[in-house]
Regions:
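A short helix/loop element that forms part of the nucleotide-sugar donor recognition site in Leloir-type
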Residues: 179-192, 377-382
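Aromatic "clamp/platform" in nucleotide-sugar-dependent glycosyltransferases that forms part
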Residues: 277
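Short hydrophobic beta-strand element within catalytic cores of glycosyltransferases
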Residues: 44, 294-297, 304-307
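A conserved mid-protein helix/loop that constitutes part of the nucleotide-sugar donor-binding site
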Residues: 20-31, 197-220, 224, 233-239
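Short His-centered aromatic/hydrophobic patch
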Residues: 93-99, 118
Length: 388
C-alpha cells in the first residue's frame, strides 16, 4: 500500500463470471490490491460459468447464465442493497454493463469513488451499451474512467466533454510466473510435436481473433506447426478451413488451457502470432512478451502501443491485416532463423517490464484514494494531472 494511501474497502465489479481477459485482469488487480492491505471483494453481476467460484472473496449477485428483464431489476435491487450494507470506499468496474449499470447504482448507494474501466474500443459495444455507457459517464456516474490503452481512450473522442474529462489510461499489468519446464518437457506436457518450430496463438476462436489468417498462410511456410489454444464458436469453421487448405496435420486445436498452465504453453512455443482485428490491450501479447517469444501481430493501434511503435522501434513484427504475403514472409523468416527469434524474444522480454501488475495497481490505487482531490486523475505517462 502506498504510504499516503489509507486502507480502503473496495468492490471490484464485473458483468459476468466467464473465461476472459477482463475477468483475469480484474482478479489479478484484486489480489494485488489485497496484498497492499486493502479490503477487496470481487462481485460478478451474473454467472455464465462457475469458473471462479473457488477464488477468495467472490460474490455472484444473480446465479443465472443470462438475466432477462426481471433479472436486471433483481440485479439493481440486490446491488443497491449489498452496496449499502457493505459500504465500500470505491467501486472499480470492468466491462460495459458493470460500468454503466453498476456505477449508476453505486452512485445511488452513496459510493464516493466510482472507477469505470473500458476494456475495448467504444465502437465494439452494442448500440444500447454505447448509449448506457455514454449516459452514465456524461451524468457523472464515473469519478474516473480508465482505458487500458491510449487507443481505447481515443475511441471516445466524439463523446461529450463531461464524459471525456474523466478519461485516463492505466495499462494492463501481468503478474508473471515463468515456467519451470524446459521446452522439450513443456511440449510433452501438451502432447505437441517434439521437433520443428511451433507458432502459437492464444485466444477465443472467434471472428475478432482472426485465426483464419494464420491458417491461410500456413501452407506457404516451409516448416512448423500452428497451435491454437482456446475455444469458441469459430472452431468448426476453422477446422473445415484447415482441411480445405490441406494443413490439418500441421494444426493443433488445444481447446481451453487453464490459466495456470499458460507459462508452460508459452515455454513450448517459438513464435507467438496474433492477427487480431481489435483489442483494448491484449493480455495474451503481454504474457508472450514476458515469456520472451518472437511476436508477429496485426498493426492495429492497441498492438502498436503495446509492442512499441512500428519499424525498428517495435519489439515484434506489426503487419497489415490485408496482406497475407507480409505475414507469410515474416513467419517464414522466423521459422528459418533461430537467431532472429532469439533477438526478438530478448527485446520483447525487456519491454514487458513496462507492463507489470504493480504499475497497473499503482494507477487504480491512486484513482480510488479517498484522501486525494476528486478533480485529479492518474496517467502513467503524466503522473497526476488536473482534468481539463
Amino acid at each position: 500500500m502506498n504510504a499516503t494511501t489509507p486502507r480502503l474497502r473496495l468492490v471490484l465489479l464485473i458483468t459476468h463470471m466467464d473465461q476472459g481477459g477482463a475477468q483475469e485482469a480484474l482478479l489479478r488487480l484484486g489480489r494485488s490490491l489485497r496484498s497492499r492491505g486493502h479490503d477487496v471483494e470481487t462481485w460478478f453481476l451474473y454467472e455464465k460459468s462457475p469458473l471462479y467460484r473457488n477464488e477468495d472473496n467472490i460474490r455472484v449477485l444473480l446465479p443465472v447464465r443470462s438475466p432477462g428483464a426481471v433479472g436486471y431489476l433483481q440485479l439493481m435491487v440486490r446491488l443497491f442493497r449489498q452496496l449499502r450494507a457493505h459500504r465500500p470506499d470505491a467501486v472499480i468496474s470492468f466491462l460495459p454493463l458493470a460500468n454503466g449499470f453498476g456505477q449508476a447504482v453505486a452512485r445511488l448507494a452513496g459510493v464516493p469513488r466510482r472507477v469505470a474501466s473500458q476494456r475495448n474500443p467504444s465502437w465494439t459495444y452494442t448500440p444500447w451499451m454505447q448509449r448506457l455507457d455514454r449516459l452514465a459517464g456524461t451524468l457523472g456516474c464515473y469519478t474516473a474512467n480508465v482505458g487500458n490503452s491510449q487507443s481505447v481512450v481515443d475511441s471516445f473522442a466524439a463523446y461529450p466533454q463531461p464524459y471525456r474529462r474523466h478519461l485516463t489510461v492505466v495499462h494492463n499489468g501481468i503478474d508473471w510466473r515463468s515456467s519451470e519446464l524446459d521446452p522439450a518437457a513443456a511440449r510433452a506436457r501438451f502432447g505437441l510435436p517434439a521437433g520443428g518450430p511451433l507458432i502459437l496463438n492464444i485466444g477465443r476462436l472467434a471472428e475478432q481473433k482472426n485465426q483464419s489468417l494464420l491458417l491461410r498462410v500456413l501452407p506457404s511456410l516451409s516448416a512448423g506447426h500452428l497451435v491454437l489454444a482456446g475455444d469458441g464458436n469459430d472452431r468448426g469453421k476453422l477446422e473445415r478451413l484447415a482441411a480445405d487448405l490441406g494443413v490439418t496435420s500441421r494444426v493443433i486445436f488445444l481447446g481451453e488451457v487453464a490459466r495456470a498452465a499458460i507459462p508452460d504453453l508459452l515455454r513450448a512455443a517459438d513464435i507467438f502470432a496474433m492477427p487480431t482485428l481489435f483489442e483494448g490491450q491484449s493480455n495474451a501479447v503481454l504474457e508472450a512478451m514476458h515469456a520472451g517469444l518472437a511476436i508477429v501481430s496485426s498493426d492495429i493501434p492497441a498492438q502498436v502501443e503495446t509492442l512499441g511503435g512500428s519499424g525498428e522501434d517495435a519489439v515484434g513484427d506489426l503487419l497489415p491485416l490485408d496482406d497475407d504475403g507480409a505475414w507469410t514472409r515474416s513467419l517464414e523468416a522466423l521459422v528459418r532463423d533461430p537467431a532472429l527469434r532469439a533477438l526478438m524474444a530478448e527485446r520483447a522480454r525487456a519491454r514487458a517490464q513496462l507492463f507489470t501488475v504493480d504499475r497497473m495497481t499503482d494507477g487504480f490505487e491512486r484513482l480510488v484514494d479517498i484522501s486525494a482531490p476528486e478533480g485529479r486523475v492518474f496517467s502513467p505517462q503524466a503522473g497526476l494531472r488536473q482534468r481539463s
